[in-house]
């Protein structure tokens, strides 16, 4: 078996090197060889479903947990989250100049009250009288999202309604434009189907190809099939023969050929009994790229296909260069995020199919530009924000809720929607006040909080620390960033006293961070303390440094020392790379270290692509053997080989690095383009912003062009120290990167 797998690896590597020499479509929705199955058309209204903020995420999370339990073998999920509720009320005061018809749709049990009087209606429609009326809808469900969609009487806009789960605390309903079909509830399946044919079929033993896609398998023979695209979906084929056929699936050939079911991350598929008459076989949903088929007595297989479930997206950001290798890295990254995009930006689709706070929110750094699906990002924000009235016992991973405000600010900057922060205002304030109440005398949050005491989890690249249950410097910097961001939103809400309170907490914490964790000799942050919370951990890791840059507290005068002397000399810094890299590479871009960023990308992400993979994994072990690369949690196939968070680094490297895109947080309609093309001759890109699209054609030599939408200002910085080109009017402009 080992010799065959080794030979198989050589054959596949050769084929992948050939196909990667030119641009490849890694996303099934863009692959011309993949068929997108048309969905049944549904009536659409000029309105959209609305629900209590965070409740769609709560029901979606429950769905993910159920899917995970049915399919995944090893699942752990520390922490308590915002609970689902089967009851909601929607209210609005109206004043009509003429009699009007109002229709609605939603779950079965919806009651309308007008001026406090319960209405007896049929057909989910009512005629509203002229004059003032107080409307109240009560929606009750058994086990689905309490929601409603309206049509008529000029009352369709969810932003003009209020929603409550208890008739006491009211807020702005949540909604999204994709949920505009009255016959499809928001928590109903939304995926589209991509029909994928095999990329390669390799007879392994006593098997041969029959025609283009037929397979003849003899007694105890088997074949290996590669679909190229790693997705979650169902396998279907026509089969006739005798005995049984055993189907094994995996993210790698090794996993798909594994005979020991105890080593698998997904429950094994039951053998299928064949008949000589033949028939269609459709197997339960699995995450896979590779499939092996083994027959004990022989079979004829035809019409093999993989029906992958894809979240419907619009590919908003575009990026292309003269270097196909860079293009493929970008496309593979985008596909990694899309594969992981089901209701949320998920953790590994094979191993657990669950949303986690850090994974979901670091993914928005790229996903918000690639796809612009604000609701998916908001779902991640909701699970990161703690449940109402949080307690210490609710904590799973102490630093994970601190990603929520990072995601909220990213969401506000990208979409320009203050409504989101207002919808989650109570939970934002409760989160910040909760953390302020559980810190020690220095204002520090500890890693041993929570019933399970899971500990800090900055990612898996912790060879240099910090320890899990001490006082980690990076977590305190995250808390500082949360206070600063809380003040930022309080200012937007025009609540000056609240903003001042958070600014004071931030000032005091920043002072303590430098007193306890700044190493003035080495000009970096140390890790913090060991698990006893007393012994100082003077080791240096990258986590506190990049959070320091993102939070604007790492001294800029020490950037050179950090990037030239400290980081390159950290043990295993380049050898063990994890899913926090999207954050860290954003810090690289912010510090202007574009060459170092891309050298890191080529060395890690490029190496993974060169090995023939089509998605990026949760963690990289650069010096490990092929078998060891797949091991995680001491399980032979425990590593997730498609992890949305690691689709982010290359996109950040392209958007914030090569293009040099950034946005002012104080004047949010002001953008900066600071290109650094490195070896590239040209870049063509379309960047979605809240005002529309910025379209760029950057040329290292000669004329470059830019088109900007109305309502924004774009600054183009061509050289350090030179006056920037400032563009304030909608239209197209030309310029040169070199004078």
Go through each PLM region and give its residues:
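Extracellular/oxidizing-compartment recognition motifs
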Residues: 23-343, 375-376, 447
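Active-site acid/base region of carbohydrate-active enzymes
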Residues: 256, 305, 312-332, 337-339, ...
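Alpha-helical repeat scaffolds
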Residues: 559-567, 598
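Non-catalytic C-terminal accessory modules of carbohydrate-active enzymes
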Residues: 599-739
